[in-house]
């Protein structure tokens, strides 16, 4: 039996899983001198936003990507969808509009793809 899942259904499921994986999302201005925000869940930094002028760029640390792929291995095959969903999730939680998303892409086993594949997706021109 083949089951079709729409993008909106997948987004709803993804947001539910993200709320379980990263409860109590909070953000604060970075303390290391760089302009931007640290986004934490239960005190642990799970995302970083860097400000370049008026633009917010989201960086997703490797351990955060690994956690997400461990729960939803299918997203390792769709990095553009993954970045779009994470951007929407962060926007909903913080109200910060994301211009681009950067992350190291991992396969479903948690290994770096091609050794060092940095994915970067821009949303607004």
What are these regions (language model features)?
Residues 1-17:
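Short acidic, low-complexity intrinsically disordered linear motifs used
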Residues 22-125:
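Compositionally biased low-complexity segments enriched in polar/charged residues
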């Amino acid at each position: 039996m083949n089951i079709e899942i729409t993008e909106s259904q997948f987004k709803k499921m993804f947001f539910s899983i993200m709320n379980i994986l990263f409860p109590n999302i909070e953000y604060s201005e970075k303390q290391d001198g760089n302009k931007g925000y640290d986004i934490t869940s239960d005190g642990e930094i799970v995302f970083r936003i860097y400000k370049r002028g008026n633009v917010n760029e989201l960086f997703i640390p490797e351990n955060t990507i690994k956690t997400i792929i461990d729960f939803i291995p299918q997203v390792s095959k769709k990095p553009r969808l993954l970045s779009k969903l994470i951007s929407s999730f962060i926007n909903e939680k913080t109200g910060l509009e994301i211009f681009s998303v950067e992350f190291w892409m991992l396969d479903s086993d948690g290994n770096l793809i091609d050794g060092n594949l940095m994915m970067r997706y821009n949303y607004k021109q």
